[in-house]
Structure formats: structure tokens, C-alpha cells
Swiss-Prot record:
Keywords: Activator, Developmental protein, Nucleus, Phosphoprotein, Transcription, Transcription regulation
UniProt-listed InterPro entries: EAF_fam (IPR027093), Tscrpt_elong_fac_Eaf_N (IPR019194)
PTM annotation (Phosphoserine): residues: 202
Gene (UniProt): Eaf
Ranges of biased composition (kind: Low complexity): 200-221, 256-270, 302-314, 329-343, 416-437, 455-471, 483-501
GO molecular function: transcription elongation factor activity
Annotated region described as Disordered, given as residue ranges: 138-226, 256-501
Biased composition (Acidic residues): 393-408
Cellular localization per UniProt: Nucleus
Descriptive protein name: Ell-associated factor Eaf
Organism: Drosophila yakuba (Fruit fly)
Phylogenetic classification of the source organism: Eukaryota, Metazoa, Ecdysozoa, Arthropoda, Hexapoda
Recorded GO CC terms: nucleoplasm; super elongation complex
Length: 501
């Protein structure tokens, strides 16, 4: 039953009837046969443009190397296709040959299995299937039947045996494994290249913790660049304000003597005397000081100190009085330190510029009133000193100093040295008091306290001014004191000393 089924399958495939046929053994089973040999050729793909009217050639070289050349059709544009490969001997594989004319079936042994591949020099892929007389008997395996003296002649009828597939299948697997290994090596190199690119990209994606390294580098390089570029650090307003405050304080602390000497020598060189100007012109001079070194220092000093602290400056700038006058003024300052300290905490950069005109006039009138009271006491002391000096025959030096002080624009520098020393000493003490009374505080927190302290000071200064006006009675209607009265008193003292001589 099994044979019948097999015959039916073969009959269907070969269009053979159901009759029983004889199986003949071919010449290959004869041990003395040296003329007949059957080979199989296996190629990697099936070409389409094969010219079946021409013969193909098989060349077996040394070391089992085989070259197969297949002619192509003229329409393909390529004359032929070349295949190269190796051959292996068969051991148990056979081939059945069916003759349609006679109906005889012959079995033959297979000699070699040839596996070839298309060479890369050719562009198109071609077929290895060769034409023969028994081409219709092909079993679909594409075998080449060669006959000849050496067993490698021209193909006459490709016929496949049932055991051929089982014999060639492992060969095929081995060849494909070799081919696949080669292709895997090539594709493996490509994959390695892709893997090489992936690590380059993957650190970029996964290096978020490692990217902070350049982020940390940039701030380290940025400060050096900012340090070189002073334009980026200078425009910040808080830095400018802080630098100016510290710079002005250092200038006041280090150059107190220079500021005093410069202000004292200003009138000798023709500058305006700050001690003898009115209240309105005194504020105008602060904003419109001449662009000299001494004028700038005086303006910076006046802007640094608050308005209540500036009331000490007219008495300091008012030159032309002896050491007794400066001593009396120093006592006057010691008697009222509490009135000067509260506003001394304000910054002079914006305090004096932000005050109203009415408040400025009130402050200047108060400062001038205090200075006038101090000068009145000093004049009284000077008159008593001049009278006592005339009686003790030592009025020459006092009268000379008074006469020199009365002429402020024409006095020599030699007669002013003792006065300058006393004023320098007093100015240094005032600068130290300012430095001790000016901490680095904000303007916003000081301005309300300054307003309250200013109102308290105004209330305290009103009865004091009334007492001074009642005692002195020599003030002008505009809040200032006339310079003519002071000069007349000084001239009277000098004349009395001359008469005594």
C-alpha cells in the first residue's frame, strides 16, 4: 500500500500510469565504470535571464574549486554570469532518471555536490539550470547530468533522486551557516558601528548627572570674566551706593586734615567763604560748587553728613577767629551732642536732595542761629582777651591776630597757622564723631526716624533761639547775622588795643 501511494504520487508528478515499471541500475553502479558521473549544483538564488539556447561551462580547478559560467539573454545587457564555489563528494545520494519515450526508470549514483555563489563582479544574477534532452523529467532540484570520459562532460538530463534532498540538505545548512556567519560578521560590524554610535548618544542622554560638570565649569569661568569686565559689575545700583558710602567714609577718616586745610585756604585763594553766606545761598553752593579738588571734597563731605550735622560746617568754615573762639565753639558742640547724633545716621547721598525747600530753610536758619550764638560768645571772649592783653603789654600778638582775622581775603598764611592747627584738631574730632555716628544702615528705615527726630529738634530749638535773640539782638531779619557788626566789633577791639599802646 505504501508503494502504491508512492507510485501514485510519482505518477501524478511525472504523468505516468499506474502500471508497474522496471527500475534499472545505471552505469554508476558498475565498479568498472569510469565514463559516467552525475553532479549536482546548488546556487544561492535563481536568476531570471538565462539563455537556454547556449551551453554553460563548468571548470573544476585545484583544491576542489569550481567555476560555473552561465550565458545570459541578450536583453539583460550582461553576456554571462559567473558562479564560483567548491565541491564535495556524495556517499549515499542517488538520482532517478525517467525516460518518457521508452518509459524506463534508471537510478544512478551522485558523485559530487557543487555549491556556488555569484561573483560580485557581475551585477545581474543568472541561472545555472542547464538545458538537456530530458529537461521535463526534472524533479525541481536543478541537477546537472554530465557524461563523458572524465565524468565532467556536458549536461544531458538533470534528474533528481529521492535521496538527493536528504543528502544535500545538511550541506545546504552548512553552507548557509558559513554564509550567515560571514554576513553576520559584516552586519555585526555594522551593528558594532551602531553600538558605537549609541554609546556616543546614550551618554548624551544618560549624562544628565554628568552634564553638571560643564555647568559647574561655566560658573567657575564666569566670575573671572566678570572680574575682567568691570562694566557688568558696576551698573548695579546697590554696589555703587555701598562703594560710594565706604569711599566717602574712608576719605573723611583719612583726609580730615586735608579737607580742613583745603577749606581754610579757600578764602585766601579767592573762593567763597561758607561761614558768611546766607541760608539760601548756602544750599545753592552745596549743589553748585566749583569743580576744584577742595570744592569737590567739601561738597562730598556736605552730602555725606545730614543737614543737622551740616550746621557745624558754617562755624568751621567761618575763618578769622582765634584759638579762644574755637575753644568756645568746641564747648558749644559738647553741650549739645544729643541734638546732633540722631540725624547723623542718615545717608547724605539722597537725604539733603530729597528735603523740601521749606525744611532746608528752617534747618539752615537753625544752623545759622546756633553759629551766631557761638560767634557772639567768641566775640565777647575776644574783646575781654584783647582788653586784658592791652593792660599786660601783650596785646600785640592778640591785636595782630584779630586784625588779621578781620581781613579774611588779605590775611597772610603765617598768621593763620595757630588758628589752622586748632581748627584742624577740631575738624578731625568732628570727622571721627561722624564716622562713629554713621553706621551702614538702609535709607528706608532711617527716613521715618529722621523726620521724627527733626520735629523734636525743631521743638527743642525754638525756645533756645528765642533766648539767644533776647540776649544778642543783633540778628538780621532773614535769619542770618550781619557780617558788618562782627567786623565792627573786631575793629573796635583792634582800635582799643592800638589806643592802649
Amino acid at each position: 500500500m505504501i508503494m502504491t501511494k508512492q507510485k501514485n504520487s510519482l505518477a501524478e508528478r511525472l504523468n505516468i500510469g499506474e502500471e508497474v515499471r522496471e527500475l534499472k541500475l545505471g552505469a554508476t553502479f558498475n565498479p568498472k565504470n569510469t565514463s559516467t558521473a552525475f553532479h549536482t549544483i546548488k546556487y544561492d538564488f535563481k536568476p531570471a535571464s538565462v539563455d537556454t539556447s547556449r551551453m554553460a561551462s563548468v571548470d573544476v580547478g585545484s583544491n576542489n574549486q569550481v567555476t560555473v559560467t552561465v550565458p545570459n539573454s541578450e536583453s539583460s545587457g550582461v553576456p554571462h554570469t559567473v558562479y564560483k564555489g567548491n565541491q564535495r563528494e556524495y556517499a549515499k545520494e542517488c538520482l532517478m532518471i525517467y525516460d518518457k519515450e521508452t518509459g524506463a526508470i534508471t537510478i544512478e549514483k551522485l558523485n559530487h555536490n557543487i555549491q556556488v555563489k555569484k561573483t560580485r563582479s557581475e551585477v545581474t544574477s543568472k541561472s545555472v539550470q542547464l538545458p538537456g534532452q530530458h529537461a521535463s523529467v526534472n524533479m525541481g532540484q536543478g541537477q546537472l547530468h554530465s557524461q563523458g570520459a572524465n565524468g565532467a562532460g556536458t549536461g544531458q538530463g538533470p534528474i533528481s533522486a529521492p535521496g538527493h534532498g536528504s543528502g544535500t540538505a545538511p550541506k545546504m545548512e552548512n553552507s548557509t551557516m558559513r554564509i550567515s556567519t560571514k554576513t553576520k560578521v559584516s552586519t555585526g560590524s555594522r551593528r558594532n558601528n551602531i553600538i558605537d554610535f549609541k554609546p556616543r548618544n546614550s551618554p548624551m542622554q544618560q549624562s544628565s548627572p554628568s552634564r553638571p560638570v560643564p555647568v559647574h565649569r561655566s560658573p567657575q569661568s564666569a566670575p573671572a570674566w566678570d572680574a575682567n569686565n568691570a562694566q557688568q559689575t558696576l551698573p548695579s545700583i546697590p554696589l555703587i551706593t555701598d562703594d560710594d558710602d565706604f569711599g566717602l567714609r574712608a576719605a573723611l577718616h583719612n583726609s580730615g586734615h586735608a579737607n580742613t586745610s583745603g577749606s581754610s585756604t579757600g578764602s585766601a585763594t579767592g573762593q567763597t567763604d561758607f561761614g558768611s553766606i546766607s541760608s539760601s545761598s548756602h544750599i545753592g553752593k552745596q549743589r553748585q560748587a566749583p569743580p576744584h579738588g577742595h570744592g569737590k571734597r567739601q561738597q562730598m563731605h556736605q552730602r555725606q553728613s545730614p543737614p543737622m550735622a551740616q550746621q557745624q560746617q558754617p562755624s568751621n568754615y567761618g575763618r578769622g577767629y582765634n584759638g579762644g573762639q574755637s575753644h568756645a565753639q568746641q564747648q558749644r558742640q559738647r553741650n549739645s551732642p544729643q541734638q546732633q547724633r540722631p540725624p547723623a545716621y542718615g545717608h547724605g547721598n539722597s537725604m539733603t536732595m530729597d528735603l523740601d525747600s521749606t525744611r532746608e530753610q528752617e534747618l539752615t536758619s537753625q544752623s545759622v542761629a546756633q553759629a551766631a550764638a557761638a560767634l557772639e560768645q567768641q566775640i565777647g571772649g575776644a574783646l575781654s582777651a584783647s582788653s586784658s592783653s592791652s593792660e599786660s603789654d601783650s596785646s600785640d600778638s592778640d591785636s595782630g591776630s584779630d586784625s588779621d582775622d578781620s581781613t579774611e581775603d588779605d590775611r597772610p598764611m603765617e598768621g593763620q597757622q595757630p588758628v589752622y592747627q586748632n581748627q584742624n584738631h577740631q575738624q578731625q574730632q568732628m570727622a571721627q564723631q561722624h564716622l562713629n555716628q554713621l553706621p551702614n544702615l538702609g535709607l528706608g528705615s532711617i527716613s521715618p526716624a529722621y523726620g521724627s527726630n527733626h520735629q523734636q529738634q525743631q521743638q527743642q530749638m525754638v525756645p533756645h533761639q528765642q533766648q539767644q535773640k533776647q540776649q544778642s539782638g543783633i540778628y538780621a531779619s532773614n535769619g542770618g547775622f550781619p557780617n558788618d557788626l562782627l567786623q565792627n566789633d573786631l575793629q573796635l577791639s583792634s582800635n582799643s588795643s592800638d589806643d592802649d599802646d
